[in-house]
Amino acid sequence: MYRMLDMNPASIGHWLPALVKANEGKTFFRIPKTTIAKAPLTLLQLSRVEYESLTAATLDVVDRWAQAAFRLKPDESYFLKTGTFSNKYDFRNAHVTEPHEVMQIGEYLLYLQSQAVEMAGPLSQPATYGVSTTNEMVVREYIPDTHDLPTIYMGLPLRCEYRCFIDCDTDELLGIHPYWDPKVMNHRFRDWPDSDNPHMRHDAVTYKLREPSLMREYEATKDLVATHVAGLLPGLDLAGQWSLDIMRDGDDYWLIDMAPAERSTFYEQAVPKGKRRPMMENWIPELGGKH
């Protein structure tokens, strides 16, 4: 099972090295510094235990593993995720800034994995399966917000983001879509069952006020982003169709995430039906020895 987790093409250890190589020698896009570690099986198993039941001694072991694996600096600010899941929608647990928080990054990472497990549980409506099907834990450089933008999701700056859909077999840009799509965002904050939650009320107002300038920024820059994404594709050594997320901060454009295209939101809106080719996945690792 552990080796099957290694087979997930969406895991960052699969696509990030190829993206870094494709961006070498180019100056338009930046990529945050990233450290990826394979979590021990015993650590992954802890996410199946109620987080509140874990003892201080257990959490201390997890923290010491993280300090050794990621070579953390107490005065740095970090963005945390598993190989496939960051839960930016609970940003206070994805972004650590204070020295005491950095010392507890192992706990934060374990909590992220536990959140992913809970999303597939019977108390989660709707239930979401497989968001953290990975054995990777990831610590990334945090990209500071240089424009003091309003925040949603308990601390996430509402910066302009772009979701590009690309075909790595044909080196073709299939489409581009605003990550913070107004129809999706307004529906999320106003129509979901938790819309009366104070955080959601805050986010509904914040997004509505930011929406006009956010969409103007997107429309003014999307062609520029698309042109530079197209320039990456000949050197991007991946197979199949992918989504590629870009975040703007001032004059900087950051390549921040990838996923198989058909698993990604806005796939049907951005990719023409005749161009869609879902990825063929292989989850069976090659085993050594005689058969």
What do these predicted ranges mean?
Residues 1-161, 165-230:
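Active-site nucleotide/adenylate-binding loops and adjacent lid/helix of ATP-dependent enzymes
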Residues 80, 244, 256:
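Active-site flanking residues adjacent to catalytic metal/cofactor-binding acidic residues
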Residues 88-93, 243, 259, 263:
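Generic hydrophobic/packing signal
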Residues 165, 245-248:
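Conserved protein-kinase catalytic-loop segment immediately C-terminal to the catalytic Asp
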Residues 216-223, 227, 234-240, 248-291:
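C-terminal active-site "lid" helix and adjoining low-complexity regulatory extension at the edge
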